[in-house]
Regions:
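Short, Lys/Arg-enriched N-terminal segments with co-localized hydrophobic residues
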Residues: 1-14
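Positively charged n-region of N-terminal signal peptides that target proteins for export
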Residues: 15-20
Length: 401
């Protein structure tokens, strides 16, 4: 066979050079690859160590309870203490607790029409909605019926109800608890009252001050927030009929014309929970000064163990008082109640980790139908100071006994 000897030599030389280069690359590549693997491993260890150092500070290590979390790296072991990541848990032991309270609420036809057009912004602006939603617990006076059944009570000037579908408004407010011990929640009879309980329960909104029987109506709503326990009671000193009172097997509301039962419950709760609160329906409509019986009842609640007393019903704001170091809020007025909402308040009660209580008033009013924070509240605070009993109000709304 004929072939070009010179060409063959060149091809053999090229193949020799190729295999030599391949062998050199292989010998050099092994240590490079090993070094790269070691580098990646050490980097990963550093990342894990940094994660533990940054995200598990000593302040988040609580005692007593153990919680195992799947999010932790495998190398982290949980031993005797509970480890809580702030990014993972809403409850933070030793953080203050913010409870917000609003007064009388009923959704008028005008409000409903606005809601259908503009959503929840028809009720309150973004700032007020944020304050309601961001509280650890938000509670209001639910002064109407959720039902389409029943007949309006005869000889009653105002009977109030809404279609159950509008419970979504309360949800959009961020409502956690509603007080139903008042003079409107049975306006359409027991069937409609039971519909109200069912509607609230389905919406996962707790109710207090009423129920299927006296045992439920007189029981508090209990919450544990940031390591502190709260028992919230509700009762009414205003009722159109004795038939509205809950009985052993009768649905209804918890009354405090005779405060014996409530005071006994408060005394028991005081020994079980860190804080006890009374949300009470009382007073005379449109009277800016509390009745003497309101002051007497409030002091009795405090003697029995209450740490805060909050009142509703007069549809106007009333003043404040401290008794044995415990604040009494005589009336929060209308919050969102038809067209009758004037100047009103969102009350913020902040409990520190050591149990101290600070009360701050968030003044608000309706502007073009929308609840809006009052930016210059000095005049309102001066008025409320004059209505109060030995209580001052700072420029930022803090009650000063």
């Amino acid at each position: 066979m004929w072939y070009d000897k010179e060409k063959l030599c060149k091809e053999l030389w090229c193949m020799k050079r190729f295999f030599k280069s391949l062998l050199t690359s292989f010998l050099i590549g092994i240590p490079v690859a090993v070094g790269l693997i070691i580098f990646m491993y050490m980097s990963q260890r550093n990342v894990s160590d940094e994660y533990i150092e940054i995200h598990i500070p000593e302040k988040t290590i609580a005692k007593e309870e153990i919680i195992v979390q799947e999010e932790f790296p495998k190398e982290l072991e949980i031993n005797d203490n509970q480890i809580v990541l702030e990014e993972t848990f809403s409850d933070t032991v030793n953080a203050p607790v913010s409870l917000s309270f609003a007064g009388d609420v009923h959704f008028s036809e005008q409000y409903i029409a606005g809601y259908e057009k503009s959503g929840v912004s028809a009720f309150a602006d973004d700032e007020m909605l944020g304050l309601m939603r961001n509280a650890d617990l938000f509670m209001l006076n639910h002064e109407f019926v959720f039902s389409v059944r029943g007949e309006a009570m005869e000889d009653k000037e105002y009977t109030l109800r809404n279609d159950p579908e509008y419970v979504k408004i309360l949800q959009e407010f961020g409502t956690d608890v509603v007080g139903i011990a008042n003079n409107h929640v049975l306006d359409f009879g027991q069937e409609a009252f039971l519909d109200t309980l069912d509607t609230l329960e389905a919406a996962e909104i707790a109710y207090v001050g009423g129920g299927h029987n006296i045992e439920e109506a007189s029981a508090p709503v209990v919450r544990t927030i940031n390591g502190q326990t709260f028992a919230i009671f509700a009762a009414t000193r205003v009722s159109p009929s004795y038939d509205w009172y809950a009985g052993k097997s009768r649905p209804g509301i918890f009354q405090t014309y005779d405060a014996t039962a409530l005071n006994k419950a408060l005394s028991t709760a005081e020994q079980t929970y860190d804080h006890t609160i009374v949300f009470v329906h009382w007073g005379i409509e449109r009277n800016e000064m509390p009745e003497e019986y309101q002051r007497t009842l409030a002091k009795g609640y405090i003697d029995a163990g209450a740490d805060l007393v909050v009142g509703c019903h007069p549809h106007v704001l009333q003043g404040f008082e401290y008794y044995n170091g415990v604040p009494i809020v005589y009336s929060l007025g209308n919050y969102l109640f038809g067209n009758r909402t004037g100047e009103t308040l969102l009350l913020n009660a902040e409990f520190s980790s050591d149990g101290d209580l600070k009360i701050q008033l968030i003044p608000c009013e309706r502007i073009n139908g929308v609840l809006t924070r009052i930016q210059e509240p000095k005049e309102l605070f001066e008025k409320l100071t004059n209505l109060s009993f030995g209580v001052a109000i700072s420029e930022n709304g803090i009650l000063v006994p």
